[in-house]
A protein has these predicted regions:
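Alpha-helical transmembrane segments
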Residues: 1-13, 73-87, 242-251
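Membrane-interface "cap" regions at the ends of multi-pass membrane proteins
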Residues: 1-60, 174-177, 202
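Central hydrophobic cores of alpha-helical transmembrane segments in multi-pass inner-membrane proteins
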Residues: 8-19, 52-61, 81-94, 167-175, ...
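Hydrophobic alpha-helical transmembrane segments
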Residues: 15-34, 72-77, 106-111, 136-139, ...
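Short helix-coil transition sites and intra-membrane helix breaks within transmembrane domains
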Residues: 22-25, 52-56, 99-103, 135-143, ...
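Loop-to-helix junctions at membrane interfaces in multi-pass transport proteins
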Residues: 37-39, 44, 61-62, 67-78, ...
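Helix-loop-helix junctions that connect adjacent transmembrane helices in secondary transporters/permeases
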Residues: 67-176, 265-310
Length: 310
């Protein structure tokens, strides 16, 4: 069943790339390839932005962190939620208008150069270096997460081979279909992520079978020994978190204003007037997803206790 599910998923991703390859044969030019001709609708813009942002860390990193260290780590999710909302409300519409006005810029380095009338390539070079270093780490972590999913479902699969498959599929649909293929694959991935995150807490309640067990008071007082050897109260650590940990968690949201893979979505939406609808979709998505992740960690901890683990 797992093999069939992955096969269908990969065929869908590659199919999107092939579709836009043939559909876009008559649509030439850099703007078409890198921004989809600035023709993306509000739903695709919203879902692709959120899926490309909250990928492996949302499904694995954040719930795993809360499961291991307590709900005090939920402050990271709150910071990211606030950052997402502010990014859509403050940056999105302005960037769409200004990138068009700045000589119809199609990349962020080009936009910054045109916006500030830079006479030398220094700004572009600095941007390129920052992007190269940051995205090498970011993409490596995404590939690592994808590989872990593969190998957890198929233990006999060599991790290196799994990573090659994962990377090859992404490269194929990206080179074939360009920006539109990337956005549409992210759109479907965003839907899949939301359905999964909403479903897991519901199935967890069914597995636990009793509401009284779900609200078991022992969860309030349970102590978790983190990977660093520190003792955490699983639930109340959210309220008793150290101020510096709260500030650190909330500060994660500041990164949104400089994430190229999100900002480029703002630049590609068809009309500035569509940003409002797109922002509503994105904000609802991120709130539902982050709340669901907290529930996943909470129910996961209950199931761990039921199995006699710590």
């Amino acid at each position: 069943m797992e093999i069939l599910a992955f096969a269908i998923y990969f065929v869908l991703m590659l199919g999107i790339g092939v579709w836009f390859f043939f559909k876009g044969k008559d649509e030439t030019g850099e703007q078409e390839y890198f921004l989809g001709g600035r023709s993306m609708g509000p739903w695709v813009t919203a879902m692709s932005a959120q899926a490309s942002d909250m990928s492996a860390w949302l499904l694995m990193g954040l719930p795993g962190s809360m499961l291991a260290f307590g709900l005090g780590k939920a402050w990271i999710g709150i910071g990211l939620g606030i950052g997402t909302i502010l990014n859509w409300l403050i940056t999105a519409k302005r960037l769409r208008k200004l990138s068009k006005a700045a000589n119809d810029s199609i990349t962020l380095p080009q936009y910054l150069t045109n916006r500030f009338a830079a006479k030398n390539p220094a700004l572009k070079i600095v941007c390129a270096i920052v992007f190269l270093i940051s995205f090498t780490i970011y993409v490596a972590s995404a590939f690592s997460a994808g590989t872990k999913v593969f190998t957890s479902l198929f233990p006999a699969l060599d991790p290196t081979f799994a990573m090659i498959i994962f990377a090859a599929i992404i490269l194929i649909y990206t080179f074939l279909g360009g920006y539109k293929a990337v956005c549409w694959t992210d759109f479907f991935q965003g839907l899949l992520m939301l359905v999964a995150l909403l479903s897991i807490p519901l199935f967890s309640v069914v597995i636990i079978t009793r509401v009284s067990a779900v609200l078991d008071s022992s969860m309030i007082t349970q102590t978790v020994i983190g990977a660093d050897g520190t003792a955490y109260n699983f639930v109340t650590s959210f309220f008793s978190a150290d101020p510096k940990d709260i500030i650190s968690g909330l500060a994660w949201g500041l990164g949104y204003f400089g994430m190229p893979h999100i900002l480029v979505r703002f630049m590609s939406i068809e009309k500035p007037s569509m940003v409002k609808k797109s922002s509503i979709v994105a904000i609802i998505w991120v709130i539902l997803s982050l709340v669901s992740v907290v529930l996943v960690a909470y129910f996961g901890r209950i199931l761990v206790l039921r199995n006699g683990q710590s």
